[in-house]
Every structure is written in C-alpha cells, then in structure tokens.
Amino acid sequence: MLNMTDLLIGTRLSTYARTLNLICLHFESGDGTIYCLHSQCLLRIMKDKSLIASSNDVYNPCTAFNGDIDEWDWSEQVGETLYDEGMKNGLSEALPLRVLSVSFGKCGDIFLELEQGYSIEIIVTTVTDDESWRFFQMLHAEEITFVYSGDESYSIGISNPLKPVTVPDIAERSTGLAHRT
C-alpha cells in the first residue's frame, strides 16, 4: 500500500510558490514525478531550528518596505512580503533538498525533515471542516490526493469516492494519511 510517507521520502523539495495565502511546495522524485503539497494553514520553514519563513508572514511587508503600512495590501504584494523574503533569502539557494523523514501529529500536522538541517512544519489550526492542506501528484491521470479537513483525512481518486481515515489512526501508524486510489 502506498502512502504519503512512502511517496515523499527520498524526493527533493525543488520549487515553491504561493497564491495569496496558499503555500505550494513541489517535491520531485528520481523519475521526474512531481508531488505537490499545498498548505492553507500554518506552515513553518526552519533551518537548524531557526525560523526562516512562516505562512503568517504573507500578511506582513518585507523589511525593505518603507511606505504607509495602512495602505499596504498583502493580497497585491506577491513577492514583497516577509514570507517571500524569508523563502528567497533562507531557502531558494539551498534547493533542491532531499526529504529524509515524514511524520504526522495527532491533528493532521505534518513534519518533514530535509537535508542540510532544514525542516517543514505544517500545523492544522482549525477545528472546522475547512481543508487545511492537500497532497497530490502533479499532472497524473490517476490522481493521488490526500486531504486533511476537520477530524478526518481523505484519499480522493478520480474513480473512487472519498474514503475517510481517522486522525488517531494516522497518529498511531505515523506512516501516511490514506492509500493510493
């Protein structure tokens, strides 16, 4: 059975992007397959246990900003936020970075350990049924998608209905969220 852990370990974080407050991380396998991890909750990028960038920083101007903060609109400032600055200065030149380990918290949190002392933490911050993060294979006819929303995680496939997996089950196994559909 394939799971998110099996799919991510050994891949390399190759690129990142964001659309408003949706953070997109792309992981490339040795055969060129690209897996995407999209976060709509708290995401932290660390280097040797120091914070490089946080998804909360998309709402703050970069350090070079010298205008009126009351007129600054984060939604119109792609590339000019404190998050963008942290990613550019703290992560860009280190890419690609190999994924060494993947673990999960009790509430659907994800912890990725990368080479060179980097790590990624995705922390679910809501009790609602809103989607917190999504993992999928890019440009693939048989979609592999893992979604964390509320108290359950789902494996979504083109030909299969949603299949729930409870969060306590995830925490006990610490191996992934669902299976390939």
Segments and roles (model prediction):
Residues 1-181:
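Surface-exposed, interaction-prone regions used to assemble/regulate multi-protein complexes
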